[in-house]
């Protein structure tokens, strides 16, 4: 089960309604009460939180989500498919007529310049930020050892001040070589996660 609070995006009908004063959104304390009720009800029926916004019965967690949030490389094939591999992230074009018109042999020889509608090369900093953002979004949190193995640098030399501050505030829990959100930290996770962007 995935449960999210509504985020009103620019350019959407909800944003227009909000600006016109016709969209009533719950106050922050009401949202917190809804979140608490959600946790209570999911636990009552045997669902456990395994990511910031996802709940499942033990053994039924979404494997796709787990792979994505764990930073496991993935390859997507076909119309609109997304991939992330060796610091490169790309997605295929979404237009079916354009997709059918491609000369795939030529595309593959040339590195897929038309097939890959979007392409991004991630810097090491981008990858570190993503490690923190995605890893902390899981209830298992992040591993200092995995960070060191992946980036060849100690996590505290990059994020030490932030990790210490949120641990001292009771928003992160540091156990062994892992950091994870406390229950209170989960409630304000969007704010905390944005602080792990290094720019």
Predicted features along the sequence, with ranges:
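Short, amphipathic alpha-helical interaction segments positioned at domain boundaries
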Residues: 184-199
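Minor-groove-contacting beta-hairpin "wing" of winged helix-turn-helix DNA-binding domains
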Residues: 178-182
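C-terminal scaffold of the Radical SAM
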Residues: 1-153
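Short amphipathic alpha-helical interaction segments
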Residues: 152-167
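A short, conserved structural fragment
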Residues: 167-177
């Amino acid at each position: 089960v995935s449960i999210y609070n509504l985020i009103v995006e620019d350019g959407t009908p909800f944003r227009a309604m909000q600006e016109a004063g016709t969209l009533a959104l719950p106050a922050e304390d009401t949202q917190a009460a809804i979140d608490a009720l959600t946790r209570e009800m999911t636990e009552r029926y045997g669902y456990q939180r395994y990511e910031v916004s996802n709940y499942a019965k033990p053994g039924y967690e979404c494997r796709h989500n787990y792979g994505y949030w764990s930073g496991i490389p993935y390859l997507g094939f076909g119309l609109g498919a997304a991939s992330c591999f060796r610091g490169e992230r790309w997605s295929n074009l979404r237009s079916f007529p354009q997709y059918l018109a491609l000369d795939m042999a030529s595309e593959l020889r040339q590195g897929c310049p038309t097939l890959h509608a979007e392409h991004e090369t991630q810097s090491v900093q981008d990858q570190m930020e993503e490690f923190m953002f995605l890893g902390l979004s899981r209830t298992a949190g992040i591993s200092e050892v995995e960070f060191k193995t992946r980036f060849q640098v100690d996590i505290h030399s990059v994020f030490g001040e932030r990790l210490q501050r949120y641990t001292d505030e009771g928003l992160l829990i540091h156990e062994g070589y892992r950091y994870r959100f406390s229950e209170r930290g989960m409630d304000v996770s969007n704010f905390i996660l944005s602080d792990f962007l290094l720019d």
